[in-house]
Amino acid sequence: MRGWVDVIAACGRPHQRDAAVELGAQRFTTEDREVTGAADVDLVVVLTPPASHGRLAIAALEEGKHVLLEKPLSTSLDEAKALVQMARRGPGLLLTAPFTPLSPTFQTIARHIRRGDIGTPCSARARYGWSGPWWSEWFYKPGGGCLFDLGVYSIASLTGLLGPARRVMAMTSVALPDRQVADRTVRVEVEDNAQVIIELGSGALAVITTGFTLQQYRSPALEVYGSTGAVQMLGDDWDPEGYELWRNDAGAWQVFKETAPDWPWTDGLRHLVECIRDGTKPCLTPEHAYHVLEVLLAAQRSGKERQSIDVTSSFDPLNLGDAGPTEAAHLVHDRTREHSPPAAGATGAGSD
């Protein structure tokens, strides 16, 4: 983003001053109003713990600023609803993480699904987790938890691919009640382990595994199974490593190497700045972010109440823009037929 924006002001704790200045901030403050209300600030980036997301975003939107917001949109549906309404009527754009649908690999997979390459989607799986943060205790306190921090990625990706959810059922637990944060032991007060089942509006079912309990894994980040095929993203949805496509009419798995290995999971900043510059709307909408939050809160509630929870919000399909370039043939590896000569008139397996 060098040359696109200037870092006018940064807000944080006193010990963060030197780092902010070193990274280019022209001034530093510990008072957030000195950023959200500053006349020379056009775009506010909120990177605080979730409990303060809504308050800070509302303050910035009230001042006519554009806002880039860490996930989730808020921890409260009422606050989130106010944010969506402000974004609809105000001059400022609102873009909320996760930004996984911006990746070229995600968008290519979405086009395969929309084009009917795997038939009607019937079921899906998603997974994201790790052993858990050791640098701050808010992850293990109310307003934190593995769903807000990790499950949000899977929910954003699955609903981005398959559309809105209509019902959620979850089992959540505290698997490891004591965590080491820096040099002290912290008691875990929110879920660190979750399994979520989502019934989508289309009738498809999706399962999400997430938690601060996954030491390592090698399975795909996302899997979508349709009536005539399947597609799965390799790596994590925030760091794709290509994808695999099965079509019954092809009779083989086609393996597509990652075509954008340098794509950053922070790409939302670039996207938002481009939208501001060009006068366009982001392809990730506040309505989608609100829906993701409703699913998250429904999963938390379901885990506590041990019953399914209906989801009432919706959103329009994500605008993926024009189709991306066709993958070069040398980037494609068909692991069941790689040594077979192509049939007469056949096209490359990587055509998108």
PLM regions and their residue ranges:
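Beta-loop-alpha module in the N-terminal Rossmann-like domain of NAD(P)-dependent dehydrogenases
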Residues: 25-86
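Hydrophobic residues in well-ordered beta-strands that form the structural core
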Residues: 29, 69, 94-96, 125, ...
